């Protein structure tokens, strides 16, 4: 028999202990959280040339601008046009453009259709986000019968007349949605000597002066007149059947016709925040947001992750490229392309940018934790890290200024701050309440420490209470982290960090680990001896996927119950030490099936459904049952029944109901008989000696290899069904005898 006793309060529990870490990996943003189903929606796609990532020097990580990728043009032709394009090293190259794009940074497609072809109608199609590889030919627009979908596109008629029909069809070309239509007529002379290319030199004239007539043919369609001859068409369509399909835009013209196309959007009309005017740009997929919301995250870290650093100069995440109108956002290839099934087809559209991340934080009631580039490219093994010169004007002016401008964007007064005015004009005049910021991701070494100091000092000169998060590097081992931790503790000891920060710390240090379940269980006592000196811990990326232990990263071995148990054991240690462990977050958060660059993730999804993994269920059990006070826990065992595989934590509230959340993790293959002593945790804290105590017990248990699964089609399966029991004890001094199942996580809630 093992006796578990809940004792006196030890400290205030960190109010930010459980958060989420979002990075656009595994198509977590485009194809996932981004509600728009159109792949390369704006003809601005920039991709990794996957043949170059194994090369060396300047030939490595080359950029491939492919503005028409993921679009098929049948019986019509298309040209990519714009005033700039990405070069092979990511540089912006000026190009000739016969007519203005919607924004100077953007490109568009000029589409020409001749008289009707004998082979059939003219149309263009987009399959959506199917993950590529063997799945590259599959349609990915998820349609549900009788559901409403929003269609939006920007059109500029150039020549001739046509009717454009927009809708989703199945793999056989049969309608999956109703069709919406718009017509245009260009009342002008035929094309001159540019007819061979289909380009006009005077396309930039105002719509009202160009002899253009355009109108929706559907009662629910609407036309909005834009600049430079552009029109915005918005309409709704209705699902006819439930299936995956592809977007089709059919061109019905009795003569040669040319039009420009940009910003094509198709999404579920019931996106997250529908009807809220602040969600006027990027839109979010509701079921994914609701799955994240169910974790009750205290914070949201964004946008990563290694994409913060990028893999080569120019590939770093630049937050200023992600705000403003959608057309103004400068796309970038994702460094995670090399992990994709086809090795390259991963462009960051930035339809979800920093503004959308801040709005999501607000809706989730989670504090924002943006993390910015610190002047050092990704330092992971096998990469080619480049260091920006710390003495350069670019670093001292532009790089540091990015941090200061972001704080103004988030918190500033729109009347006096230009970046705060951008926030206001995007739909959010009120500040977002930013109180912490990450400086680099998984960076380490003397150069990083020097850059961290320069950045944090500039921040604290203006915003002394802003909490700066410092990286401990890639690996969770003391020798690797020593430089960062020594420096952080020195800053805290010399009063050189933040003053009166939100967590009370001078500085936070970000540790990461992707180790084995056994390692995580062994680290439940990791923080017991960490100094309480004003330098707090953020365990910012963790997953018991066995990567650091050299274990194969396979689909079969990912997200097993064994991995979730190891993580649960570790989290009991984080709760017990939440006076120094301020924040934790799992990574990666989201993964598209089959676009998984990492095998193990917290939440998986396909175009239609969500799969909360067993790891998610453990995370949710912990994050939704956390008190504001942590209590001492003792485990008394006999020699014949050792409890070395038992891990316990207890938090609660010192209110009238004296609520306690007691978490017990058994990672062994044997049941454990436990006596839970509640007297020290209840009667000793003022509960009436004669008042009954209500106990609610929830147990998650399964075979170590158990896991949930989801395919490209269909719903998830294999979910662990919680076992729930309720008891009433006659008084707070009573003991509860219970059997803790093997391979289990048990939550006892006492009131």
Language-model segments: what does each one mean?
Residues 25, 376-379, 534-626, 630-648:
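Aromatic/acidic polysaccharide-binding cleft in carbohydrate-active enzymes
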Residues 667-751:
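C-terminal beta-sandwich/jelly-roll accessory domains of carbohydrate-active enzymes
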Residues 405, 409, 413-415, 425-436, ...:
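Active-site neighborhood of glycoside hydrolase catalytic domains
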Residues 20, 153, 296, 361, ...:
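Conserved, mostly hydrophobic/aromatic
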């Amino acid at each position: 028999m093992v006796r578990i006793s809940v004792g006196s309060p030890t400290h205030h529990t960190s109010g930010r202990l459980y958060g989420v870490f979002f990075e656009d990996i595994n198509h977590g943003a485009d194809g996932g959280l981004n509600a728009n189903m159109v792949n390369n929606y704006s003809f601005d796609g920039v991709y990794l040339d996957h043949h170059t990532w194994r090369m060396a020097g300047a030939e490595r990580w080359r950029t491939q601008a492919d503005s028409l990728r993921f679009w098929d043009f049948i019986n019509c032709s298309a040209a990519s046009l714009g005033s700039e394009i990405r070069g092979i090293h990511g540089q912006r190259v000026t190009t000739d453009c016969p007519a203005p794009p919607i924004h100077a940074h953007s490109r568009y497609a000029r589409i020409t259709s001749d008289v009707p072809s004998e082979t059939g109608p003219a149309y263009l199609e987009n399959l959506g986000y199917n993950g590529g590889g063997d799945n590259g030919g599959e349609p990915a627009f998820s349609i549900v019968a009788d559901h409403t979908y929003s269609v939006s596109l920007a059109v500029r008629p150039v020549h001739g007349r046509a009717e454009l029909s927009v809708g989703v069809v199945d793999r056989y070309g049969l309608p999956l949605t109703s069709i919406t239509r718009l017509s245009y007529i260009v009342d002008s002379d035929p094309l001159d000597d540019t007819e061979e290319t289909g380009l006009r030199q005077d396309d930039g004239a105002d719509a009202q002066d160009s002899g253009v007539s355009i109108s929706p043919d559907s009662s629910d369609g609407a036309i909005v007149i834009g600049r430079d001859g552009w029109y915005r068409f918005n309409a709704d369509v209705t699902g006819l059947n439930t299936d995956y399909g592809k977007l089709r835009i059919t061109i019905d013209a009795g003569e040669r016709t040319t039009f420009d196309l940009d910003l094509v959007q198709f999404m579920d009309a019931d996106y997250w925040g529908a009807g809220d005017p602040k969600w006027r740009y990027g839109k979010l997929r509701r079921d994914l947001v609701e799955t994240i919301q169910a974790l009750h995250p205290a914070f949201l870290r964004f946008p990563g992750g290694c994409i913060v650093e990028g893999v080569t100069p120019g590939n770093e995440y630049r937050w200023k490229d992600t705000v403003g109108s959608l057309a103004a956002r400068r796309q970038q290839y994702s460094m995670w392309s090399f992990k994709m099934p086809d090795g390259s087809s991963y462009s960051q559209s930035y339809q979800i940018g920093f503004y959308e991340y801040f709005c999501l934080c607000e809706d989730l009631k989670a504090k924002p934790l943006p993390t910015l580039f610190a002047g050092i490219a990704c330092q992971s093994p096998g990469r080619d890290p480049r260091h920006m010169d710390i003495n350069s004007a670019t670093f001292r002016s532009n790089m540091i200024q990015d941090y200061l401008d972001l704080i103004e964007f988030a918190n500033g007064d729109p009347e006096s701050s230009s970046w705060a005015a951008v926030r206001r004009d995007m739909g959010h005049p009120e500040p977002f309440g930013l109180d912490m910021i990450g400086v680099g991701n998984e960076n380490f070494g003397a150069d990083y420490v020097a850059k961290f100091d320069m950045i944090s000092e500039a921040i604290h000169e203006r915003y002394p209470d802003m909490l700066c998060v410092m990286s401990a590097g890639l690996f969770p081992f003391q020798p690797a982290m020593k430089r960062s931790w020594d420096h952080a503790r020195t800053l805290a000891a010399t009063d050189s960090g933040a003053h009166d920060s939100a967590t009370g710390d001078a500085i936070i240090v970000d540790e990461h680990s992707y180790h084995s379940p056994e390692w995580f269980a062994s680290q439940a006592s990791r923080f017991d001896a960490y100094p309480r000196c004003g330098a707090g811990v953020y365990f910012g990326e963790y997953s018991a996927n066995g990567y650091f232990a050299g274990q194969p990263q396979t689909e079969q071995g990912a997200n097993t119950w064994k991995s979730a148990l190891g993580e649960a054991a570790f989290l009991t240690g984080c709760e017990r030490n939440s006076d120094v462990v301020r924040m934790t977050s799992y990574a990666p958060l989201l993964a598209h099936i089959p676009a998984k660059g990492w095998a193990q993730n917290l939440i998986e999804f396909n175009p239609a459904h969500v799969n909360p993994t067993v790891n998610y269920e453990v995370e949710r059990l912990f994050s939704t049952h956390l008190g504001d006070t942590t209590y001492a826990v003792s485990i008394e065992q006999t020699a014949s029944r050792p409890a070395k595989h038992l891990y316990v934590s207890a938090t609660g509230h010192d209110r009238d109901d004296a609520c306690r959340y007691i978490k017990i993790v058994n990672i062994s293959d044997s049941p454990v008989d436990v006596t839970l002593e509640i007297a020290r945790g209840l009667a000793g804290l003022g509960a009436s000696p004669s008042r009954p105590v209500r106990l609610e017990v929830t147990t998650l248990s399964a075979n170590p290899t158990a896991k949930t699964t989801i395919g490209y089609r269909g719903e998830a399966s294999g979910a662990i069904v919680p076992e729930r029991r309720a008891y009433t004890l006659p008084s707070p001094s009573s003991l509860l005898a219970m059997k803790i199942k093997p391979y289990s996580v048990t939550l006892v809630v006492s009131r």
